[in-house]
Amino acid sequence: MTFEEKLSKIYNEIANEISSMIPVEWEKVYTMAYIDDGGGEVFFNYTKPGSDDLNYYTNIPKEYNISVQVFDDLWMDLYDLFEELRDLFKEEDLEPWTSCEFDFTREGELKVSFDYIDWINSEFGQIGRQNYYKYRKFGILPETEYEINKVKEIEQYIKELEE
């Protein structure tokens, strides 16, 4: 199998896994994975047909009366797929990404992008990264001044890395 074929296979598996985690009809999914050799995180938001409201994945068990244990197992399967995707880059002697944005629609549109920022060795934690992502992706600023300032710090940090 070529690298592109392997990518396509994993992309399909990721999209199918996320789709299976959402127990209602959905329109768009916005996924972010931060992974390095020491671990990481994966989270996603989705929209429902006719609405632009973002639904955060951790609300699914409570909203739809789904076992937290079952949902956590599905989430671990999803995390493992993103690790597999990252390992594929290593196998091909490509630089392993540290973040992957994975967006797709019900109609089958897919947009995947990778970044190589060393988040783990930065001063920015999980909440800061998630707030920055929501701001960059959706224009949503966090509620507290402290969190807003963290988003601005991350923005500055990334600008400096790009120079």
Swiss-Prot record:
Keywords for the protein's UniProt record, in alphabetical order: Cytoplasm, Virulence
Compartments (UniProt record): Cytoplasm
Cellular component GO terms held in the UniProt record: cytoplasm
Lineage: superkingdom: Bacteria
Pfam families attached to this UniProt entry: YezG-like
Disulfide bonds, paired cysteine numbers: none
Complex and partners: Interacts with EssD (via C-terminus). Interacts with EssE.
Role this protein plays: Component of the type VII secretion system (Ess). Also acts as part of toxin-antitoxin system. Counteracts the toxic effect of EssD via direct interaction.
Protein name per UniProt: Type VII secretion system protein EsaG
Gene name as annotated: essG
